[in-house]
Each structure stands twice: as C-alpha cells, then as structure tokens.
C-alpha cells in the first residue's frame, strides 16, 4: 500500500517547477496572498525596471525602491519609504485589507503605505515597463494608485509635475539628503502657477534656480531649447481652473532620466548601452544661481561670468560691489519722467524711452498681458508708470514687468529681447558721449605715440636698450586682479579680526604647516571656528597662486571639497579663511601609530569614495573642468564624521569647453604624486590627477607614505610593493596590518581597490581610467581591466617635497625643490 518514489516525483514535480520559476523570474504582481519580502524582486514585463529592497552603501537601513534592472551600478529612480527605513531582518510589501499598498516590518507595524484605500482589496500591484508602480483593480482594471503621482528625486518618461490651486495638490521632485540617504534633502523642483509657468528649484523657502517662462516648445532661460531643439517635454495650463501639467515624453528608444541631486544640480541622462551620458546640467555657472547680480543687475555668461548693471543703472552700494557682493544689485542713475498715454511718435524731451537688450533670459516676476502684437505691448508698458520693462516673445506674447528686474542673464547666443524703461536723457546723451570719448581717446593716443617716439630717439642716442618699468603706488593694487564678479559671495576679513580670532597667530592655535605657510585655528566673535592659512613670503605661492585659489574655490561647492569662507589682504600679508575641520588632515591619522586605529577599513573605504566623488565633481560635474595638480594625503581634510574634503587649490588649473590637456613652463606638485608625463614634459590633464589619486589610494590602503616606504633589500617603492602584492595575493596583503586583524574587512573590496589604484598609476596616461570610470569601478562588481606593470619611481628621501620645474620647449633648464 506504500507510495512509490516515482509517484512522489510525479506529484512534486509541478511544485518544484513553479518554485524555480518563482525564484528566477521574480513576482508578476503583489497581492494579499503573495507579498514581496526581503531578497525578492518584482520585474516589469519587458525587464527594464525592477522593484525590491535595497540598502544604500551596504548600511543596515533597508528601503523599497525601483531601479533599472540590467544596468550596473544600480541607479534607484524611486523610493517608497524614503523617510523611514526598515531596520528589522524581516519585511513585507503587501496589499492591505482596504486595498492600500503597505510595507510591514517584522512586528507587523506599518512603515509606509500608499494612504489611498480603494473600495475593496480585490486588487494587485505591478510594475510597468515605464518604471511606474501601479495598483490595479482586479475587476475594472482601473488604476487606483501609481508611483508617478508620488515622485522622488527622478523623472522618467511619461511622468509629470503638476499643481492644482483649487485642491492644493502638487507634484514635485525632492532631492535625496545625500548620496546614501534617500530621505528628502534641501532641494525641491516644482512647476510654478505663473502665466506662463516655469520650473524652479527651491532650496528651503528660497528660489535657487529657475528655468524662465515656457514658450510653447521650451524654456526661455535654457539656450539649448532653441527653435531647432526637439523637446522631450510639454507644458499645459488651464488658467481658469488653476491647473498646470509639465510632462516628460519619450522621444527615443534610449533609457533616459531627469534627477535633482543632493547638491542641487538638475541633470538629464541617457543610457547609450555602456554607460550614462550627461546631456544637460543646471546650474552650470554662477549666472544660473537665482538673483546672482541682484535687482537690475545683469549676469553675463562670458568667461568668466561677471555681473554688471543694466544700461542706465549703477551699483546700489558701490563699496559692496568692490568687495565682491553684488546681491544688492543696481539702482537708476536718472529718475523716470513717466509721462503716460504718449505715443512713441510724439515723444518729446523728458519722455521715457526704452532700451532694447538682446540675448537675455527674461527676468522673474513677469506678468502676462493679452496684447496682440509688439507695438501694443510697447504702448501698454509706456502708458503704465509702474511698468519697468516689456518683452514680446514668440510662443508667449507680451510680458510686462511692474517690479524690480531680478535674475536677468545675458547669453552670448540665444535668449530673448528685453526692452528696459529709461529716462530719455540716458539715450539722448549716449551719442554725444561717444563723440567726446572718441575725441579724447584719439588725443591721448596721439600724445602717447609722440611721447614714445621722442623717448625712443633719446634712448637710441644714449645707446641704451629700452627698459620698461611699472610702478605701483598702492600696496594693495594687485588686489584689483580680483574682479568682484569672480568672487561673488566671498567675505573680505579685516586683519584685526583675524588677529583677534587666532590670538595674534599664537603658536598654541597652530594646526600645522602647509606647503605655502602655517595654518591656524581661529574663533570669530560669533563663536564660529575657522581655519586660517597664512601665506609666507618665501612659500612659493605668489600673487598668481593666491588669486587663483580665491577665484577657483569660491566657485566650487561640493560636500567633498573644503569651503572657502573668505580672505584677508593687508599689505604683504595674504590669508585664506576656510571652514574649520576638527579632524585636520588625513595624514594626521593615517601615519600615526595610535590614531590610525580610528580609521578602520570601512572608514578608509568611505574616504576613498568621498575623494573620488570630489574629484568627479572637479573633472566632470562642476561649472568648469578643474585639474587639481596637487592631490595628496595631506590635502585631504576630515570633518567630525571622517568625511573627506579636498583642499589646497593654489596650483589648480581650469579647462573650458572641449579642452582636455595643457602644458606649463613651470611644473609644480609633490614628488611621488606627479605623473610621468607631467614631471618630465609639463603636460597635465585629468589623467595627472588620476595618477595622484592612485598613489593616494595605495597610501590609504597600506597606511604607508609614498615618500618614505622601503621594502626588502631591493628598496622597493610603495608602488612596486603594491604590484607584487597584487600579483601574489590579489592585493589583500597590501592592507595596513595594524587594522587588518581588527576590522575583518571584505577582502574582495580591498583587492578591488588595490587593482583600481594600479590602473590609476599606469605609465601611459591613455592606460589610466578617467574619474567617472573609477567611481563606476568602485561601486560595481564588473571585472576590472588587468593593469600593466607600472613605472616605479626611484626611492626618495623621507620628506614630502614639492617640486617646481621651469622648462623650455625641449629640455629642462632648472629645478627647484621646496619642503612641503
């Protein structure tokens, strides 16, 4: 009467088949009886998107999210429980009894829900090929809820932003708090109810960036969206019902996305089959920041960007403008006459006129007027004494400004025409002024030419070659090289303020000795701590490097870059004031036998990732391409949470447009970190920084200095030792032995970092990865290229040194080495 094994197999086979299909293919839908649990995923029918649990940066926090299924590294496009992560080992995403989608922890507590109950629980949740998670009624197949109506930081094709003034409903994008924290951050992207509408990025309650009004096919504040641009977006407004909808359409077969980053950048990406290509980024320069030049100020997108007053206006507070603070803007030089109801044909003396400004982004605070043509628009503004400007824009019609003109940008190409109201005397005197200025200029030129000729004749008679001398009667005149528009938002400190803060540069306040001078801790009167870099006269950092550091850092904003608060100039004294970082520099911990134990492998890996993100910002994501040229362990500062910040930009260089490399007659940097092509030919590029990053990476892993490491009888350098470790054990043995036993690191992670470091220090620049590839290598599990044996530098003395080489075109003529 027993059951044969064959019969058992026949009975159980369908169940095993169902189970294997379930585990391999993922859920088709989520129902009351089939919840989604940790470790399981729900895929879209075409396999484009996937829903499941994920943990940012391998933390203990678990989130339910949607990501691109077949793309590595993972790109999360939506998070359900972004404000409340799961911290228990068990969790379920299921349909509740009232038809809501709910997330339960191990105690059956509701962590997150859709908060929109349906009529019944006869429904299911599924993921569409658009990336939209939907709840569908089993009977009517109507959509009861969808994730596209509750966006996070990302827009996908077929999603939208909206507002409804009657109900108060709005659909916005909100940034993550950080790269590893999906909770709502500082930035929100929303559609405004203005007519016509525009897209604004808010930082808290303040406008951070705006697109300009929508003109049928694009935004007037985005020059890229010209007449030839095929827009993937559409915008519709129903003014009567108080609604607006901004939709993202699918224009190609490529995967695309729009994201607001935790740093406030709005970016558009497309996937080309091998990686994500950045198509658009804003803000791209200082002019993109809202109201950078204040009311009636004009931000000019030249190189570099700069502020100026509109025609007929002057700085409101001249001293503030000289100090680089333009946010107060400009005021009229001549008050308006404002004689209303006069036609342009009968204008006489004293009647207001309009000055036409081309290639501009229309200012904010505009009002739509239903005039049928440009002439009516002109007359409508002229007849209204409070109207300060007008514009008649194709695709919009007439816009009027009855307030201050704020956030106006002038482009080199593109943009609109803006007519500004001025007193008639502002234009009447312009022709007369040109004649006077031209006459004076011609007279001065003739006088100088005659004087130069007489001087040349005199020197010829004396048989002495011409000598040019430039005299400077002001000890601070070099400061004029700092154009105010280049250092907007920077504070100029008085010397007595800094002396008081640092206790007159007391030795007890000294934090350390940098390459260009000592660094002191200071405390301002408001109890704010600062770090003061005091440049010594013999430091080697002259006026050029000092001005370079001020101009450069003031334009860069990233969580992994040190923040410049201001500077102080007093005679020959030059000081830079930075944010104070309590843990000083990385070398303080890394090379100290006791302190190094505080930075175990997880902390070191976090530091490596932070530095790579900072370098990615410099090379790719900032408003300019920046080559640091002196990346090293002592230039990595640590905050109170051991997050790294790249510092010391005195030697950095900026690239514009498509420029990828440059050379210099003066090779500057630190021995051991300089790439071969830079050290011997002066040629530098992004790959020069990559080489230095590779050395830095190996130092962080090993806990050894590049300048003092010596191994074996052959005296191998750190690079040579790293190469041998990689050949023998995959690089695991390179890890600092003082932490290798205590922190039980993931060997695969260490080995991967060693291999990345070796790829970065390849002899030929073309063999090194770029920083975007480095970041991808660190965050993915794909196979890495095999590195070639690097060129190992000769062992150098136990002292970190900065080298400055002045070279001719074909050979090195002089080398000077300074202690760093």
Curated annotation (Swiss-Prot):
Q: What is this protein called?
A: G-type lectin S-receptor-like serine/threonine-protein kinase At1g11280
Q: Which residues carry this modification: Phosphothreonine?
A: 664, 815
Where do the PAN domain residues begin and end?
Answer: 338-422
Highest taxon listed in the record's lineage:
Eukaryota
| Sugar-modified residues | 57, 92, 98, 241, 272, 325, 341, 384
Annotated Gene Ontology cellular components are: plasma membrane
- Per the record's keyword annotation, is Aminoacyl-tRNA synthetase included, yes or no? no
| UniProt cross-references to InterPro entries, sorted A to Z | Bulb-type_lectin_dom, Bulb-type_lectin_dom_sf, Kinase-like_dom_sf, Pan_app, Prot_kinase_dom, S-locus_recpt_kinase_C, S_locus_glycoprot_dom, Ser-Thr/Tyr_kinase_cat_dom
Q: Which GO terms describe its molecular function?
A: ATP binding; calmodulin binding; carbohydrate binding; protein serine kinase activity; protein serine/threonine kinase activity; ubiquitin protein ligase binding
GO terms, biological process: recognition of pollen
Q: Which UniProt keywords apply?
A: ATP-binding, Cell membrane, Disulfide bond, EGF-like domain, Glycoprotein, Kinase, Lectin, Membrane, Nucleotide-binding, Phosphoprotein, Receptor, Serine/threonine-protein kinase, Signal, Transferase, Transmembrane, Transmembrane helix
User: Ranges in the Extracellular compartment?
Assistant: 29-434
Q: Per the record's keyword annotation, is Transmembrane helix included, yes or no? A: yes
Span of domain EGF-like: 283-319
Query: Which residue ranges are assigned to the Cytoplasmic compartment in the record's topology?
Result: 456-820
Q: Which residues cross the membrane?
A: 435-455
């Amino acid at each position: 009467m027993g059951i044969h094994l064959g019969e058992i197999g026949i009975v159980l086979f369908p169940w095993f088949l169902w189970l294997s299909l379930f585990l391999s293919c993922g859920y088709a839908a989520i129902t009351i009886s089939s919840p989604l649990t940790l470790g399981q995923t729900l895929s879209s029918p075409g396999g484009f998107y996937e829903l499941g649990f994920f943990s940012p940066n391998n933390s203990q926090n678990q989130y339910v999210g949607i990501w691109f299924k077949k793309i590595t590294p993972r790109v999360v496009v939506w998070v359900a429980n972004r404000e409340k992560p799961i911290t228990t080992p068990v969790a379920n995403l299921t349909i509740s009894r009232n038809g809501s989608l709910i997330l339960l922890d191990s105690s059956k507590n509701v962590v997150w829900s859709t908060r929109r109950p349906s009529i019944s629980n006869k429904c299911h949740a599924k993921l569409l090929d658009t990336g939209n998670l939907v709840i569908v009624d089993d009977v009517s197949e109507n959509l009861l809820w969808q994730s596209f109506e509750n966006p996070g930081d990302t827009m996908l094709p077929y999603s939208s932003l909206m507002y409804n003034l009657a109900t108060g409903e709005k659909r916005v994008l909100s940034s993550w708090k950080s790269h590893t924290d999906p909770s709502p951050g500082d930035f929100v992207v929303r559609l405004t109810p203005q007519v016509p509408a525009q897209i604004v990025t808010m930082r808290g309650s303040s406008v951070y960036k705006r697109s300009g009004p929508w003109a049928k096919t694009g935004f007037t504040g985005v020059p890229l969206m010209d007449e030839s641009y095929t827009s993937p977006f559409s915008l519709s407004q129903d003014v009567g019902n108080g609604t607006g909808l901004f939709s993202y359409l699918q224009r190609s077969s490529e995967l695309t996305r729009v994201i607001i980053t935790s740093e406030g950048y709005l970016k558009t990406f497309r996937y080309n089959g091998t990686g994500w290509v950045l198509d658009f980024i804003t803000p791209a320069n200082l002019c993109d920041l809202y109201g950078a030049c204040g009311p009636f100020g004009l931000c000019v997108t030249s190189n570099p960007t700069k502020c100026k007053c509109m025609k007929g206006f002057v700085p409101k507070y001249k001293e503030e403008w000289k100090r680089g603070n333009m946010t107060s803007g400009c005021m009229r030089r001549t008050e308006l006459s404002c004689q209303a109801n006069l036609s342009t044909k009968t204008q006489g003396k004293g009647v207001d006129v309009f000055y036409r400004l081309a290639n501009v982004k229309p200012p904010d605070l505009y009002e739509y007027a239903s005039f049928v043509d440009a002439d009516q628009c002109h007359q409508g503004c002229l007849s209204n004494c409070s109207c300060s400007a007008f514009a008649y824009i194709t695709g919009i019609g007439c816009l009027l400004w009855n307030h201050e003109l704020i956030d106006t940008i002038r482009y080199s190409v593109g943009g609109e025409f803006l007519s500004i109201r001025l007193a008639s005397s502002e234009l009447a005197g312009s022709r007369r002024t040109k004649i006077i200025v031209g006459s004076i200029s011609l007279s001065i030129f003739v006088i100088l030419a005659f004087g130069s000729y007489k001087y040349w004749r005199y020197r010829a008679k004396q048989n002495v070659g011409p000598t040019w001398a430039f005299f400077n009667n002001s000890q601070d005149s070099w400061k004029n090289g700092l154009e105010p528009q280049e250092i907007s938002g920077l504070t100029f400190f008085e010397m007595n303020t800094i002396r008081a803060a640092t206790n007159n540069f007391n030795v007890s306040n000294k934090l350390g000795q940098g390459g260009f001078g000592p660094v002191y801790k200071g405390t301002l009167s408001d109890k704010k701590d600062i770090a003061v870099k005091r440049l010594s006269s013999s430091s080697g950092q002259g006026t050029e490097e000092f001005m370079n550091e001020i101009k450069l850092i003031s334009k860069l904003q990233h969580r992994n870059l040190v923040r410049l608060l201001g500077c102080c100039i007093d005679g020959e004294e030059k000081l830079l004031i930075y944010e104070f970082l309590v843990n000083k520099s990385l070398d303080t911990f890394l090379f100290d036998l006791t302190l190094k134990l505080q930075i175990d492998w997880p902390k070191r890996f976090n530091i490596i990732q932070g530095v790579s993100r900072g370098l990615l910002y410099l090379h790719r994501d900032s408003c300019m391409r920046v080559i640091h040229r002196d990346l090293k362990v002592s230039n990595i500062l640590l905050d109170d949470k051991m997050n790294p910040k790249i510092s010391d930009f005195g030697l950095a260089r900026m690239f514009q447009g498509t420029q990828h490399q440059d050379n210099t007659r003066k090779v500057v940097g630190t021995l051991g970190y300089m790439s071969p092509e830079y050290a011997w030919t002066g040629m530098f590029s992004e790959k020069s920084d990559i080489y230095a990053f590779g050395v830095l990476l190996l130092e962080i892993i090993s806990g050894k200095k590049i300048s003092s490491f010596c191994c074996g009888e052959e005296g191998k350098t750190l690079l040579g030792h790293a190469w041998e470790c990689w050949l023998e054990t995959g690089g695991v043995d390179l890890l600092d032995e003082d932490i290798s036993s205590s922190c039980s690191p993931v060997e695969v992670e260490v080995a991967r970092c060693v291999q990345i470091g070796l790829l970065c220090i390849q002899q030929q620049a073309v063999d090194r990865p770029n920083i975007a590839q480095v970041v991808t290598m660190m965050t993915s599990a794909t196979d890495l290229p095999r590195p070639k044996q690097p060129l190992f530098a000769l062992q150098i003395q136990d002292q970190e040194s900065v080298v400055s080489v002045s070279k001719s075109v074909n050979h090195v003529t002089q080398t000077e080495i300074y202690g760093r």
